[in-house]
From Swiss-Prot:
Cellular component, GO annotation: cytosol; glutamatergic synapse; growth cone; membrane
Domain-related comment: The DH domain and the PH domain are both required to mediate interaction with EPHA4.
Protein name: Ephexin-1
Superkingdom of the organism of origin: Eukaryota
UniProt feature, compositional bias: Polar residues: 123-137
UniProt GO MF annotations: ephrin receptor binding; guanyl-nucleotide exchange factor activity
PH domain mapped to chain residues: 489-601
UniProt subcellular location: Cytoplasm; Membrane; Cell projection, Growth cone
Gene designation per UniProt: Ngef
Keyword terms, alphabetized: Cell projection, Cytoplasm, Developmental protein, Differentiation, Guanine-nucleotide releasing factor, Membrane, Neurogenesis, Phosphoprotein, SH3 domain
Region ranges (Regulatory region): 1-272
């Protein structure tokens, strides 16, 4: 028994069949290849009804869709249709040659058609069928966006590209990862600049124009005309990949296989951006593997280098890079297999999640050795002339493209941090509350745990040596305090001037108002010293960091400029002590005050509320932290400005990992447009919403409630 909907679905399909019989090529080009016994269309009505549902792509039909299609047919003039038909007919003879150019088997090409294979009958049948995307866009038909069935499901009918095609594509990447990463981040910076300037220009134009309301009315009246001429579907890429003359492609949408499949006419711009983000993750992994392979084959396995280095030195220098490369190879292979399933990539974050949870521990081992690796490399350059000469000779090889040996050694750490950002880029483009969003959030969480473990591994090695060195330099005038602890590390150290108070001699000459003291600030302890000869420090006071309070003095003139008050609520003698301290500059005073006692008023304020309306900057020059309270910046990092000094220093919080620290303002440029800042915050909140304690608390309550009901 058929319903009314099935009858409505059947009518336009029979019409398309009747029109397609006028052309010899129409049915064969529109539908996937069928077995020989099913190639002929049935003649009887019953057979047609039994076979029709199997040919329909599962997209719900709505009356709005039909009206939009009919309106589009009426708007198109006869001359335009003839012109398009004449443009399509000459291409039909080239279809075989185009396929052979891709090195694709003929037997696997029939399931999808290319735009060059359309004739008049096939075009009319495709437009009257229920398949979306054949010239009809969601803007023309709102029913498509409201339909529960997405366009991605319709793309399941598209046949995958053979494995050899993707492997050849990956092998033709001509960039080393260092070049790839630099080009990508620089293009990202330039894209943000253009977006900022474009939106800002539009906002200025809207303020100058006095007839904005009338223009909006004219736009509403012209919506029907826009249905007749569909807008451009191609999305502007955020990051231009592989801009290299030796590479035969730049973007996912520029691949010949993608352009010939007609899929760009089906996908919405946001879905194309998502495809570009996933494609970048795969191609960047291929570039990274290429650089790792060069590190191993060109440097590590060099016979002359093996003779120069002691086995222990080689082990420290290269660590477990073979394990890292093996994981990267398997990871890349699975990503390639995923791309071979369909020319439209379904998802990659599930693969990232599995590898981050089960295999990326090799990165923690490698990165944790970074401190000893850098030290060993410097010692070898200084002490072994043969090593220095050989490395310089190997770096001149054209394979290295002028890149130093040290840039290859830090590849794993750069890759694991960049991989997290690539997953964030995917997360910003997937549909909210979808399965792909959940997978991306899980992958991002696992990668963040790996990155944190890598950072902790590096810090643990360097902190232990630093604490031992500080302990040896200290002499206690008071009760000794144990400095070395596994849970203690240095936050800041430096010299300040303590105000001792005016003292007048018999000659009425004022003695020195300030005297130098030296502070060691740890994460849980403050030690106040005086520097003595022999590079030693005499400790005369200390206090837990949680019992410190700071207060900035108002402008009292040049003498008391950059002066602040430090209060120890309970010092080494169990008494309250007050110190009036003077810094060398305003930025130094602000940095000490921020480190000694962070703003307690915002300690328990939510992440969302404390960052609203914050100024933002993006990093345009990389910066390496020189002191523990500074923040290392990478190109294209976006940061919120929390504190700014007049002498050019900024205390900021990086959005993608919420790390805080000081950095020179000359390394960044401000994002002026409020819309861009709001968009950056929105994306940040979406990425970190799994870490929101309120959200996790509510989630735990829901779980507890469900258990109680059971």
């Amino acid at each position: 028994m058929e319903t009314k909907n099935s009858e409505d679905w059947g009518k336009p399909q029979r019409k398309s069949e009747s029109s397609s019989r006028k052309s010899n090529h129409g049915p064969a080009e529109m539908r996937p290849a069928l077995p020989p016994e099913n190639r002929e269309a049935p003649e009887t009505g019953e057979e047609t009804q039994n076979e029709e549902p199997r040919r329909l792509i599962p997209i719900q039909r709505h009356s709005l869709f039909n009206r939009a299609v009919r309106h589009r047919h009426k708007a198109r003039s006869t001359s335009e249709r003839r012109a398009s038909d004449q443009a399509d007919l000459p291409k039909m003879g080239k279809s075989v040659n185009e396929r052979s150019a891709f090195n694709l088997p003929q037997g696997r090409l029939s399931p999808w058609r290319t735009p060059a294979q359309r004739d008049t009958g096939a075009q009319e049948a495709s437009e009257s069928s229920s398949t979306p995307g054949n010239g009809t866009t969601p803007e023309e038909c709102p029913a498509l966006t409201d339909s529960p069935t997405t366009l991605t499901e319709a793309l399941q009918m598209i046949h995958p590209i053979p494995a050899d095609s993707w492997r050849n594509l990956i092998e033709q990447i001509g960039l080393l990862y260092q070049e790839y990463r630099d080009k990508s981040t620089l293009q990202e910076i330039e894209t943000r600049r253009q977006q900022d300037a474009e939106i800002q220009g539009n906002s200025d134009g809207s303020q100058v124009g006095e007839d904005a309301g009338e223009e909006e009315e004219e736009e509403e009246e012209g919506e029907e005309e826009e249905l007749a001429s569909p807008p451009e579907r191609r999305a502007l890429p955020q990051i231009c990949l592989l801009s290299n003359p030796h590479s035969r492609f730049n973007l996912w949408q520029d691949l010949p296989e993608i352009q010939s499949s007609g899929v760009l006419d089906i996908l919405q711009p946001e879905e194309i951006r998502l495809q570009e983000a996933m494609f970048e993750l795969v191609t960047s992994e291929a570039s990274y593997y290429k650089s790792l392979n060069l590190l191993v084959s060109h440097f590590m396995e060099n016979e002359r280098l093996k003779k120069i280095l002691h086995p222990s030195e080689a082990h420290i220098l290269f660590s477990n890079v073979l394990d890292v490369m093996a994981v990267s190879e398997r990871f890349l292979l699975e990503l390639e297999h995923r791309m071979e399933e369909n020319i439209v990539i379904s998802d990659v974050c599930d693969i990232v999640y599995r590898y981050a949870a089960d295999h990326f521990s090799v990165y923690i081992t490698y990165v944790s050795n970074q401190t000893y690796q850098e030290r060993t490399y410097k010692q070898l350059l200084q002490e072994k002339a043969a090593f220095r000469e050989l490395i310089a000779q190997l770096e001149l090889d054209p394979k290295c493209k002028g890149l130093p040996f040290s840039s290859f050694l830090i590849l794993p750490f750069q890759r694991i941090t960049r991989l997290k950002l690539l997953v964030q880029n995917i997360l910003k483009r997937v549909e909210e509350r979808s399965e792909r969003e959940g997978t991306a959030l899980d992958a991002h969480k696992e990668l963040e745990m790996v990155v944190k473990a890598c950072n902790e591994g590096v810090r643990k090695m360097s902190r232990t040596e630093q604490m031992i060195s500080i302990q040896k330099k200290m002499e206690f005038k008071i009760k000794s305090v144990p400095i070395i602890s596994h849970s203690r590390w240095l936050l800041k150290q430096g010299e300040l001037q303590q105000m001792s108070g005016p003292k007048t001699s018999r000659t009425l000459r004022t003695k020195k108002l300030f005297r130098e003291i030296y502070l060691f600030l740890f994460n849980d302890l403050l030690v106040i010293c005086r520097q003595i000869p022999g590079d030693k420090y005499q400790v005369f006071d200390s206090a837990p960091r949680g019992l410190l309070r700071v207060e900035e003095l108002e402008d009292q003139g040049q003498t008391l400029a950059n002066v602040f008050i430090l209060r120890l609520l309970e010092n080494a003698d169990d008494r309250e002590a007050t110190y009036m301290l003077k810094a060398s500059s305003q930025s130094e005073m602000k940095r000490w005050m921020t480190s000694l006692a962070p703003n307690r008023r915002t300690k328990f304020v939510s992440f969302t509320s404390r960052l609203l309306d914050c100024p933002q900057v993006q990093c345009v020059h990389p910066y390496v932290a020189q002191q523990p309270d500074e923040l290392t910046l990478e190109l294209a990092d976006i940061l919120n400005i929390l504190e700014k000094t007049e002498d050019g220093w900024i205390f900021g919080e990086r959005l993608h990992d919420q790390e805080r620290g000081w950095f020179p303002s000359s390394m960044t440029e401000e994002i002026l447009n409020p819309k861009i800042r709001s968009q950056n915050l929105k994306e940040c909140f979406r990425v970190h919403k799994m870490e929101d304690p309120q959200r996790s608390q509510n989630k735990d309550r829901r779980k507890l409630g469900s258990r109680n009901r059971q």
